[in-house]
Regions:
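Structural signature of nuclease core domains in nucleic-acid processing machines
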Residues: 1-167
Length: 167
C-alpha cells in the first residue's frame, strides 16, 4: 500500500513524501487496531421497515452489524458529519427492533494527537421513531430552503452543551 501511494505521484518528492506516506500508514493502522476488537463477531445485515406516519416509511438494510453494534471507521478527523452515518442507521434499528440492545461506535482521527478518537452512541433518550420523523421533517425543509443551522455549528453547540461549556 505504501509503495502504491508513492507511485501514484500525489506525495511530495523525496524523503518528505516518503515520511508523509509512512505517517499516513501509521495513522491508518492505528484506526484499524482500534476497530478490529469491535468487529470480532460475524458481520450481518438487518432489513428495517419503519412506519413514520403520514403515509411515509423508512425501509432499507443496515449493515454491517457486529453483534448488536455498528462500527464506523473513518480516516478523517472525527466530527459531527462522521457521526451521522452511524447515528441514523442506529435510530432505524432502534425504531424497527426496540427490544435490541443496539449501539454504534465511531472511530476516527483526533483533532490533536495520535490516539484514535472513539465516540460511542447508544439508545436515544427520545423514541427513535420520533427522531426519525424529525430528521425527515428537516430533510423536507432542506429541499425547500436553506437549513437554519449548519452541521458543524450544530455539532459544536451540542458538544459544548453536553460538556457543560458555554456555547
Amino acid at each position: 500500500a505504501l509503495r502504491a501511494e508513492w507511485c501514484r505521484g500525489t506525495l511530495p518528492p523525496g524523503q518528505l513524501g516518503w515520511r508523509k506516506a509512512k505517517d499516513i500508514l501509521e495513522q491508518a493502522a492505528a484506526l484499524a487496531r482500534e476497530a478490529l476488537p469491535l468487529r470480532t463477531e460475524a458481520a450481518r445485515a438487518v432489513d428495517v421497515d419503519v412506519e413514520l406516519g403520514a403515509g411515509r416509511r423508512l425501509t432499507g438494510t443496515v449493515s454491517p452489524i457486529f453483534g448488536n453494534r455498528l462500527v464506523w471507521t473513518t480516516y478523517s478527523k472525527l466530527d459531527g458529519k462522521h457521526l451521522l452515518p452511524a447515528w441514523i442507521p442506529l435510530l432505524a434499528l432502534n425504531a424497527f427492533a426496540p427490544e435490541g440492545d443496539w449501539s454504534a461506535v465511531c472511530i476516527g482521527r483526533p483533532k490533536r494527537g495520535a490516539q484514535p478518537r472513539t465516540r460511542r452512541l447508544g439508545r436515544p433518550d427520545t423514541a427513535a421513531v420520533d427522531l426519525l420523523r424529525d430528521l425527515v421533517a428537516i430533510y423536507d425543509l432542506g429541499r425547500r430552503e436553506p437549513l437554519p443551522l449548519p452541521l458543524k455549528t450544530s455539532y459544536a453547540y451540542a458538544e459544548a452543551r453536553i460538556g457543560g461549556k458555554d456555547p
